[in-house]
Amino acid sequence: MIPEKVRKVLEANGLEALEFEPGSTPTAQLAAARIGVETSRIAKSLLFKAKDGSYFMVVCPGDKRLSSAALKRAAGSKLSMTDADETERVTGYRPGGVCPFAVEGVAILLDEALGDYATVYPAAGTDATGVATSLGELARITGGRIVNFSEADRS
């Protein structure tokens, strides 16, 4: 079930969430397979913490890994990824369902590579949801800043 705070944001912006079986989309790869799109069209959301205690949510294509140097430039300081418990405490979402909607006190950084596609799919608050949107809509809805900080996954 989609969290009420996310549902309100989506409805206010004319977006509709996709809902699947519980636990069916916990990774970008599984979400892509379930939705029927390339992994690069899944907008994964990762939470980071700066030394000063501020938080940054990075939203990037599901097939990308982050360039730490570019991330540091975008955030203005070195960041450390938060663990599952801290992520849930700060965002209200568990890993697999983390999304940039209805998150307070967190700077949102959106990878410009998401703009390679007309439609991308971030989670909608649980690991069984997604929402079809665009980079432009994500920036408008979340107030996020568009930056370039990812690189192709070489694994």
Show where each model-derived region lies.
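Extended, low-hydrophobicity, polar/charged segments
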Residues: 1-155
